[in-house]
A protein has these predicted regions:
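Export/targeting segments at the very N-terminus of extracytoplasmic proteins
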Residues: 69-89, 127-163, 173, 182-193
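Substrate-binding/active-site groove segments that recognize
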Residues: 177-184, 197, 222-237, 258
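Bacterial N-terminal signal peptides
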Residues: 6-16
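Short, functionally critical alpha-helical segments immediately adjacent to catalytic or ligand/cofactor-binding
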Residues: 79, 88-98, 151-168, 200-205, ...
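Acidic, glycine-anchored loop motifs typical of Ca2+
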Residues: 239-247
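Compositionally biased, proline/threonine/alanine/serine-rich low-complexity intrinsically disordered stretches
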Residues: 14, 18-73, 77, 86-90, ...
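C-terminal soluble interaction/assembly domains
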Residues: 280-379
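Signal peptide-directed extracytoplasmic domains
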Residues: 92-145
């Protein structure tokens, strides 16, 4: 959800990506945070390892048991024990109040309120695909340098870039500290967002951004890759070698940081993410009896089946989209089901899920990347 501005036309083409369809167009991008040169960034101890846009299972709308002021007092005390300076906390917490708009957005994420089929259809329209292909051609040199370093295909990086921030057109206008404090206090995922709040405070405390300019998404995601603060501290890189990590305005740092994340998440160079498959009602009934769903992990992981060799899916009657048989391969694959569309997904798909735990999102990334690869083949 962040990137180098490509003009009003790109914003129009990708508007559906950066907001739910019923919302009005996003406001103009906020001032770009000032990034201070840094060689090595060490994150504070984290409670969890979140995805870029966290979507773990949530409890049903719990009510906070203490006042926000009392809660913030406790958070401040813990922040001090984590090494955050009092002066930073004074700046960050003075006048801080929860934002009800952020709570509303958390309840209406398109990945959660739209079906997989509808979400994918909305993103894979001709205009968005054309824009992605254009970016793949325009930025091919830096994309190739990043690919050579990390082994992540250019089309995958471009697809994520577009879905996250419309190639930098919209990186968020919500104050990050306010967003994270609101979500941590809300109580649906307190450990996750409390941890991210401390990481965000560390970013400010280290002087990596100026607090008045530290804006992001409603979930506290920052920069063109829409990294959560902990991900910024762990995975963001100075790929252009100018002495600072800048995921707000440097395409090289943006792409390098995304690629570093995916490589760390287990992306295997040269392997596919998955494929769309054809499944009849009779075959689906057999699958439901023979292949259990996963029972652990974030919501997206629990919405896919356990892994089976492609050869086993072949034996169950799963077909290629043209009606031919699947290869008799030992490659491990899980089934992701939509209302009408179905996908066998491989290990590289799991790396995309690590970036954003939503099957609708991950399938969209894969399909957009496939389209880009067909239109801009490697030389």
């Amino acid at each position: 959800m962040r990137f180098v501005s490509a003009g009003a036309l790109a914003a129009c083409l990708w508007a559906v990506v950066v907001a739910a369809p019923q919302n009005p167009p996003p406001p103009p991008p906020p001032p770009v945070p000032t990034v201070t040169p840094t060689a090595t960034v060490t994150p504070l101890p984290a409670v969890t390892t979140p995805t870029v846009t966290p979507t773990p299972a949530a409890t049903p709308d719990p009510t906070p048991t203490v006042s926000f002021d009392d809660w913030l007092t406790a958070v401040r005390a813990e922040a001090v024990t984590r090494g955050i300076k009092e002066a930073t906390l004074d700046l960050a917490f003075t006048g801080l109040t929860p934002d009800p708009v952020i709570i509303a957005r958390d309840r209406t994420q398109p990945e959660l309120t739209q079906s997989l089929d509808d979400y994918v259809t909305a993103r894979l329209n001709p205009k968005t695909l054309a824009r992605a292909a254009e970016v793949a051609r325009t930025d091919k040199d830096v994309i190739e340098r990043v690919r050579a370093t990390y082994g992540i295909p250019g089309p995958i990086m471009v697809a994520i870039w577009g879905l996250e921030s419309n190639f930098g057109q919209f990186t968020g206008v919500r104050p990050v500290i306010t967003a994270l404090a609101t979500l941590a206090y809300d109580g649906r995922r307190p450990a996750l967002f409390r941890s991210e709040l401390f990481q965000a405070l560390a970013i400010v405390d280290k002087g990596l951004v100026n607090l008045p300019e530290f804006n992001g998404s409603w979930a506290g995601a920052i920069g063109q890759p829409q990294f959560m603060p902990s991900s910024f501290l762990k995975y963001a890189v100075d790929f252009d070698g100018d002495g600072k990590i800048d995921i707000w305005t440097s395409p090289a740092d943006v792409l390098g940081s995304m690629a570093n994340y995916l490589k760390t998440a287990g992306w295997t160079e040269g392997a596919r993410w998955g494929r769309e498959v054809k499944i009849s009602k009779t075959v689906m009934a057999k699958i439901e009896k023979a292949v259990p769903m996963r029972s652990t992990g974030c919501r997206a992981r629990r919405e896919m089946t356990q892994a089976r060799p492609v050869s086993e899916w072949r034996d169950l009657g799963v077909l290629e989209m043209d009606g031919t048989k699947l290869p008799a391969a030992s490659l491990s694959a899980s089934l992701v089901r939509g209302q009408k569309r179905n996908f066998l997904v491989y290990q590289n798909y799991q790396a995309i899920i690590e970036y954003n735990c939503s099957n609708a999102y991950a399938v969209s990334v894969g399909l957009i990347a496939d389209k880009i690869a067909r239109e801009t083949p490697a030389k």
